[in-house]
């Protein structure tokens, strides 16, 4: 009888150890964060050519990136540099599907609101005041369902968008506001109004 009880305790102990190891195995997420170099972005202006006027320039770029599960990967501001007729900047991404939201030339008000973004639906709810806007104006673009792949150490990143694979993520941005000035002239004639 003591022998049967001893065997039961041993079997129970083995099952508990196996159960604990399986539970721990399921809790460890697969690290798929792209920790190597950041992904280069090629930013094209959708409505203007660079250099036309101050409104057609990009000075800073904020990349807000989410993975396919809607988890925030990156929400950072980096400087943008002009290379020929394309602005370039950097953004972090994960291996797999990414959704990129690019905001250029953010105002102080817009920067405060964008810094608080942690969920993908939050981006569409953000508004800002364009009163007193000075050049360069804020611009916005997005690339959804971009597939990022890289070596296991994060090097040699490639991005595929619309079945085209390249080492640079192409982004087209358009102005979020317009600045204009006008002069009103009333034609005064001696007749009736």
Where in this protein do the model-derived segments appear?
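Bacterial signal peptide processing site
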Residues: 23-26
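Short, low-hydrophobicity acidic/polar segments
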Residues: 37-191
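C-terminal motif of bacterial Sec signal peptides marking the signal peptidase cleavage site
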Residues: 18-21
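Short intrinsically disordered, low-complexity coil segments enriched in acidic
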Residues: 1, 191-193
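Non-catalytic accessory regions used for complex assembly or targeting
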Residues: 32-34
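Bacterial N-terminal signal peptides that target proteins for export
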Residues: 1-11
């Amino acid at each position: 009888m003591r022998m049967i009880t001893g065997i039961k305790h041993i079997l129970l102990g083995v099952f508990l150890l196996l159960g604990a190891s399986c539970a721990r195995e399921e809790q460890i997420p697969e690290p798929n964060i792209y920790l190597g170099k950041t992904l280069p972005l090629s930013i094209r202006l959708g409505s203007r050519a660079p250099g036309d006027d101050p409104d057609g320039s990009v000075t800073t770029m904020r990349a807000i990136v989410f993975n396919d599960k809607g988890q925030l990967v990156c929400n950072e501001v980096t400087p943008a540099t002009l290379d020929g007729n394309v602005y370039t900047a950097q953004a972090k991404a994960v291996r797999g599907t990414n959704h990129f939201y690019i905001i250029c030339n953010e105002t102080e008000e817009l920067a405060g609101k964008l810094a608080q973004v942690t969920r993908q639906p939050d981006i569409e709810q953000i508004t800002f005041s364009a009163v007193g806007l000075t050049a360069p104006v804020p611009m916005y673009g997005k690339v959804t369902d971009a597939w990022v792949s890289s070596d296991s150490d994060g090097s040699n990143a490639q991005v595929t968008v619309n079945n085209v694979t390249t080492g640079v993520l192409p982004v087209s941005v358009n102005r979020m506001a317009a600045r204009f000035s006008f002069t009103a002239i009333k034609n005064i004639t001696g007749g009736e109004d």
